[in-house]
Every structure is written in C-alpha cells, then in structure tokens.
Amino acid sequence: MPKNKKRNAPHRGGGGGGGSGAATSAATAGGPHRTVQPFSDEDASIETMSHCSGYSDPSSFAEDGPEVLDEEGTQEDLEYKLKGLIDLTLDKSAKTRQAALEGLKNALSSKVLYEFVLERRMTLTDSIERCLKKGKSDEQRAAAAVASVLCIQLGPGFESEEILKTLGPILKKIICDGAASIQARQTCATCFGVCCFIATDDITELYSTLECFENIFTKSYLKEKDTNVTCSTPNTVLHISSLLAWTLLLTICPINEVKKKLELHFHKLPSLLSCDDVNMRIAAGESLALLFELARGMESDFFYEDMDSLTQMLRALATDGNKHRAKVDKRKQRSVFRDVLRAVEERDFPTETVKFGPERMYIDSWVKKHTYDTFKEVLGSGMQYHLQTNEFLRNVFELGPPVMLDAATLKTMKISRFERHLYNSAAFKARTKARSKCRDKRADVGEFL
C-alpha cells in the first residue's frame, strides 16, 4: 500500500477541528490501541503512584542520603514521604508494595527517626506481617529488611519485643520452609538474627532460635561427610546466613549455654573449611576464630585437642595457590585466613579503625568485628550515620552518648572535592615510590650500556 494511502493516517492541513478528529489523532499518535480493563490492579497502582509521585520514589532516599535531607528537606517533608510509603505497602500491586518497602528500608537506614517510628510501629508491623505472609520472594526480602531496621531504630525495649513476638514466628516459618525461595530464606535468616539480637527477652526463645539456625547450617556437616549428598550453591548461601546469625546470637548467650554449643560444634565446624564455596569457608573460619575467643575468655588455659590438624588446615587456606580457583577468591581467602590463623595460634587480632564524622571506633576483637559486619550488612551506607546518632548502636559498641554538633560545625569539617583530589594524588605518588623500591630492577640492567 502506498504511503499516502495508509489506513488511519492523519489528514494534512486544517480539516474540521471537531472533537472526534482530535480524539482520532491522539489515539493514532500514541501507537496501537490497547484494551484496558476497568478498575484493574495495574490501573489502580498507576493511579496511586501518580497521586503519590512526590513521596513514592524509594531511590530518592538512597541517592540523597542523610546530608541532603538535612540541607534541602525539612523533617515534615521527610515524614510526609514516609507516610506515603507506608500507605503504599497496602497497594494491590506487588511491585508497588515492594518499592514502598525498599523506600522505607532506605529511609530508615539513612536517618534516625525514633519518634516517627515509635508512633507508627503497629501500622508498620501490620504491613510487614501482611507482606511476609502474602508476598513473593522479593517482597518478603524487602519486608524482612524493614523489620530489622525497625528494631534497630527502636532499640531494645517493650516496643521491639512486641514486634519480634508478632513477626518472629513468621520469619522462622519462612526460614524453615523448604518450598520458599532460597533468597527469601537467606534474607529472613539474617534479619531474624538481628531482631533477636536486639529484642529477645525470653531466654528459651533465644535457645529456640539458635536451634532453628543449627538445623539449617548443620546440613553442610552432612554434605561434607557424605560424598553422595550434593548441595546446590543457593542452599549453601542459606547455610552461610544461618551460621553467621547463629554466631551473632551466641555472643549474647549465658556462659553455660556457650559451653554446650562449643562442645557440640567445635569439632564439626572445621569440616566446613573444605567446602567448595569460598564464602562458606570464610564464614566457617571467622566463626571458629570467634569461638576460640569466647572459649579463651571463659578459660584462659583453654585447650583444643585437634589443634595441629586445625592449624595445618588454616595454614593451607592462608597460602592457597589452587589454580582451579578464581584469583579474587584466593586473594580474599588468604587475607581472612591469615588473621584467623593468627587468632588461633597467637591469640592476636589485627585492630581495625572505623571513622565516622569526627569520631573513631577501634574494632579489636572477633566478637566486635562480627557484630559490626552484621549491622553494616543490614544498614549499608547508613551504618556511619547510625554510629553517630543511634543510641542503641552506640551502646553496643561502647561509644557513649551521641556527640552533638551543629550544622555549621559539620559543614566546616567537610573536605572539598579538590582537596580530596590533592590528597589522593599525593598518596598515590607516595605509594608508587614506596612500591618501586621493592620491585625487581634487573630488567633495567644494561639498558644504557
């Protein structure tokens, strides 16, 4: 068909400008006609998002961060956005609910909003409960993450205990559900461990949670013993999260319970060091170092029977040169197991320094390192801000009350981009000179002869 004879082509020139012509041109200009069912879930979510576009973008919290919120937005604007996100957790569309949960998680991770969360904790808990029960994998992961940052915001107390009593059984059910998504189970394991660390007040419930995690990661024991049993990588990821959550909760257990767990797992955990997954090997090594630290804290003359075989295995991992493994994995593994070997043999820990604002925190033990790594995994880039202002985290890491600084002082402490560039350039030159002295110079011999 010739181009000038195309069907539904708009007329050139000024035809009779009636309403039907305008409607026809608008329909044809927009592409093929799409039949839309009245009052469908898709239309409802689009309409809701259009009305709530001012506060429904979860990425704005991740991009702006706490500094921009302080400078450009007021507390009322932030609370208005959060109220809109809370309302969107009840939307019919799963994508809208997930986006709202992610926005809440980003906002609560990057800002301390104790009063706001305290007033709306029941509404938030109901929304999280509904999303955990009826949502799919991604929505469950987002809901579990919001539950953990909700407890971090409130800290230990009656309010967090009520949240844990409501959401704890649901999280535990998802973790133990073999038909659920591995990713959802993994996230729920980490977040459930954090919530229990903060809010648990019943010692029997703490022991029950430990047993729940043990039932999961001990399946890797069986896998290592029985060569006929094969476990897929996603299952190993769940076992890693359960092991790390179990180790975190072990740090707050009474001494008698810690001794029982040490007797039960001390001689089985080394079997995980031969796992094919590098992250499992690292998690097992760091957990062993932490267990040694706890055991020696209870008994200074603690004796481990299989010390020779364990140190031999740790030394092999600290100097691993297996060609069948990726260079990045080998480099990461060697770095971790050098520290683990030093902790087991010499009772030494390489102190790390964490800077946040004008303050510094020294991580000088495996217990402190594991606790810091866990909360950093949950809070992400908001960890530094929470270390400055969150009273609960400051109590956990023994930082004292928050240091109060006004906006002018904080602004003067900031380094400009140009100054950072000069500092990085100078550091790069100094590092290059220092390394050049250690490099082999034999290749240059005879070049100018």
Swiss-Prot record:
Binding partners and assembly: Interacts with PSIP1/LEDGF.
Disulfide bond listed as a keyword: no
Any Gene Ontology biological process: positive regulation of transcription by RNA polymerase II
Role: Could play a role in regulating gene activity in the proliferative and/or differentiative pathways induced by NGF. May be an autocrine factor that attenuates or amplifies the initial ligand-induced signal.
UniProt entry keywords in alphabetical sequence: Developmental protein, Differentiation
GO (cellular component) term, any one: nucleus
Identification of the protein by name: Interferon-related developmental regulator 1
Gene3D superfamilies given in the database record: Leucine-rich Repeat Variant
Family: Belongs to the IFRD family.
Organism encoding this protein: Mus musculus
Induction: By mitogens such as TPA in 373 cells and by nerve growth factor in PC12 pheochromocytoma cells.
Region (Disordered): 1-42
The encoding gene: Ifrd1
Extent of Basic residues compositional bias: 1-10
